[in-house]
């Protein structure tokens, strides 16, 4: 790695750090602006004003916003996520099991979506303009156009209501056999794979086509090199950066999509935990869950940018 590539990587890491600071401030402000009073929601409408005020004092809700933000940010840096208002339990303990469930869902989806998307995207680019390419393009655009909640609802109607093959709800904590694993994860994974694969196929196809249109590929064709050799030896290595970018952007789509999927299928993941926390105005839990999603998205995008820099032939 030369000095220019190294400086670009360091610059990208610094941008990621600054972005993380801005995002943490935005998350704190967004949760602070949620309607409703946290103390009143915890105690109920029948609580006396004195009891509500006492709870507000105990939870430091009357402190200035900047002081509460600094206290929260300091805790994050020290690895202390705080205590849940609603459950009176350490947030790290609440999140740990749910985060594992969400990572399982994302991992299984990625294992399915990435090979499917790369295969269809690359072959579609190689056969550009053919019937196969047009069919792949039409299907992917159609899938991208359908909202994720529609795909999830349709899956429930088809597989759970009409065919009765799969359960409508996913109880991930009750999986003990492979068949049980398939039954629990099938519909959430199918729903997420549709959206992620469609996005990735489109971006992978565009990246490979852009590389195939470069002069050195055209020169290799004129010299009589086989199309397969050109794609494997010339096009794919130079399209690696854009393809990794496409994969990272598509997988980051999981972060938003998992919120809808976990809610519809009642999947016990971190997104479902955050939705439940919003209902009870459990601010520390909402903030911690939101930061995990933001950090996950930022890490994916940063890795994609760094791989793009390191795979650029002009920077080697």
Predicted segments — roles?
Residues 2-30:
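Charged, compositionally biased N-terminal leader segments and the immediate start
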Residues 15, 23, 112-113, 140, ...:
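Transmembrane alpha-helical core residues of multi-pass small-molecule transporters
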Residues 19-70, 163-184:
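Hydrophobic alpha-helical transmembrane segments of membrane transport/permease proteins
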Residues 23, 27-31, 152, 156-160, ...:
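Juxtamembrane/transmembrane-helix interface segments of polytopic membrane transporters
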Residues 26-33, 63, 71-74, 138-169, ...:
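Membrane-water interface segments at the C-terminal ends of transmembrane alpha-helices
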Residues 57-66, 81-91, 172-185, 192, ...:
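Membrane-interfacial helix-loop-helix junctions in multi-pass membrane proteins
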